[in-house]
From Swiss-Prot:
This is Tyrosine-protein kinase isoform SRK4. The gene is SRK1. PROSITE patterns: PROTEIN_KINASE_ATP, PROTEIN_KINASE_DOM, PROTEIN_KINASE_TYR, SH2, SH3. It comes from Spongilla lacustris. Belongs to the protein kinase superfamily. Tyr protein kinase family. ATP binds at residues 246-254, 268. One of its GO terms (molecular function) is ATP binding. One of its GO terms (cellular component) is cytoplasm. Keywords: ATP-binding, Cytoplasm, Kinase, Nucleotide-binding, Phosphoprotein, SH2 domain, SH3 domain, Transferase, Tyrosine-protein kinase. Its EC number is 2.7.10.2. Gene3D superfamilies: Phosphorylase Kinase, domain 1 (3.30.200.20), SH2 domain (3.30.505.10), SH3 Domains (2.30.30.40), Transferase(Phosphotransferase) domain 1 (1.10.510.10). Residues 1-53 are annotated as: Disordered. Residues 122-214 form the SH2 domain.
Length: 506
């Protein structure tokens, strides 16, 4: 498939089941939904929003959100809101706590329960150590920037990650049976917030005192463009304005667009006759449920008339292939390995969902700000008309990226995706070089059957080449899982499970 483009993104859930509440009059037990009248007073009560008469949980904005439709509620990071209803799942109905009392739908992953741990700027939840290091080492974070995350190994415990001068230090935060927390046993705290407040004032054994929360690289993606678009994701073409072409693939064009006059999106327009609309909608309904920070979010489709529109998030730098051949030429090995680990993370999620990509290649991986990579076009190859695919590519699929069992017998599995990932590793480490240079598709297929594998590219570490070769094992069952590939690449430059941790227990 040709490359599709998408925007920034990320991942904080901010979900909770209970919230802080507002003191109010009791609900009438006899008439549901009506409010008990207050006792008569000499003076009339002040005018307040109706929501304050009911005990609704209070949530706080974790990110800025600008309304996309008339049904949405805009808010800023730190704004307080009453959550009126959570029945809509990913989109909650809320009322602003300010005197205006505006109402509307909000993305549930943009808010957190007021005064909860999730509401703290420095709490990142389920973030891996390597991701914490990556974020803290970004140029916009400084000495003493920090975050607290869930422990990688011990449920209920936490880890404190702090930016030192040129590296990140990690400290284990443990919980005692009495519910207190500590970094060192000589000093315990009633809450994580108290611990942070203490170490903000003095280092007391840390590499530096805590200066400020780690700044996030991207906001999380919302579930769909809006509440309505999430439920009825077939949208009208008149809602989309195509702004500028971003490129053309085998089966259509990619555009930067604007949805509803408010939201930047990427639009893939498919050439008429490319696929059966019925089969596409069946596959797209599955694709829309696949959500992961390293997968491109499918927002909506337009299938009432051709060309079909596929609407997704917009990524600033386009395909990984073009990025590597252009602005990415200056990337060093750690950046290249990190980008590969991001792809493996997204594919590991597909693996867990028993979903097969079928066309994994650098052209189908997109790049955003801060070298964020996301897998795109997963599943589309399955619904492309076979005759058209053959006419465009000279084969039913791109041979040089395809595992031999898939190329010869159409045996597509997650293990054939692993083979393709090995080719992606080659593309990345060579800054976008075409695989099997100088060989035709027929020659490649013949040579692979005779156990030929591409030699180690210049500048490629032996350790990385060994991972490539594992991906290209003849027996699909012998190839690694994407889960294994993900941690191998994440830990590529570390030594030992406890690397980077400082033990302050004493």
């Amino acid at each position: 498939m040709g490359s599709c483009c998408s925007s920034q993104d990320g991942d904080g859930n901010g979900k909770a089941t209970a919230g802080s509440t507002v003191d109010s009059h009791e609900l009438s037990q006899s008439v549901k939904g009506k409010i008990k009248q207050p006792e008569p007073k000499p003076k009339p009560p002040p005018q307040v929003p109706p929501a304050q008469d009911v005990k609704y949980p209070i949530y706080v904005g974790k990110y800025d959100y600008d309304s996309r439709t008339d049904d949405d509620l805009s808010f800023k990071k730190g704004d307080l809101m009453y959550i009126i209803s959570t029945d809509e799942g990913d989109w909650w109905f809320a009322r602003s706590k300010d005197t205006a009392g505006k109402e509307g739908y909000i993305p549930s992953n943009y808010v957190a329960e007021y005064k909860s741990l999730d509401a703290e700027e420095w709490f990142f939840g389920q973030v891996k150590r390597v991701d914490a290091e990556k974020q803290l080492m970004m140029p916009f974070n400084n000495l003493g920037s920090f975050l607290i995350r869930d422990s990688d190994t011990t449920p209920g415990d936490f880890s404190l990650s702090v930016r030192d001068i040129d590296r990140v230090r990690h400290y284990r935060i443990k919980k005692l049976e009495n519910g207190t927390y500590f970094v060192t046993r000589r000093l315990t705290f009633q809450s994580i917030q108290e611990l942070v407040a203490y170490y903000t004032q003095q280092a007391d054994g840390l590499c530096v005192n805590l200066k400020g929360p780690c700044m996030v690289m991207e906001k999380p993606q919302t579930a769909g463009l809006s509440k309505q678009a999430n439920e009825e994701w077939e949208i009208e073409k008149k809602q989309i304005k195509l702004l500028r072409g971003l490129g053309a693939g085998q089966f259509g064009e990619v555009w930067e667009g604007l949805w509803n006059g408010t939201t930047s999106v990427a639009v893939k327009t498919l050439k008429p006759g490319t696929m059966s609309i019925e089969e596409f909608l069946e596959e797209a309904s599955i694709m829309k449920q696949l959500r992961h920070p390293k997968l491109i979010q499918l927002y909506a489709v337009c299938t009432k008339e051709e060309p079909i529109y596929i609407v997704t998030e917009l990524m600033k730098h386009g395909s990984l292939l073009e990025y590597l051949r252009g602005d990415g030429r200056s990337l060093k090995l750690p950046d290249l390995v990190d980008m590969c680990s991001q792809v493996a993370s997204g594919m590991s999620y597909l693996e867990q969902q028993n979903y097969i990509h079928r066309d994994l290649a650098a052209r189908n991986i997109l790049v955003g700000e801060h070298k964020i990579c996301k897998v795109a076009d997963f599943g589309l190859a399955r619904v492309i008309d076979e005759e058209i695919y053959e006419a465009k590519l000279g084969a039913k699929f791109p041979i040089k990226w395809t595992a031999p069992e898939a190329a010869m017998y159409s045996r597509f599995t997650i293990k054939s995706d692993v083979w393709s990932f090995g080719i992606v590793l080659y593309e990345v480490i060579t800054y976008g070089r075409f695989p099997y240079p100088g060989m035709t598709n027929a020659q490649v297929l013949e040579q692979i059957q005779q156990s030929y594998r591409m030699p180690r590219p210049m500048g490629c570490p032996e350790k990385l080449y060994a991972i490539m070769m594992d991906c290209w094992r003849e027996d699909p069952a012998s190839r690694p899982t994407f889960e294994t590939l993900s941690w191998q690449l994440e830990e590529f430059f570390t030594t030992g499970d406890d690397a980077g941790y400082k033990d302050m227990e004493r």
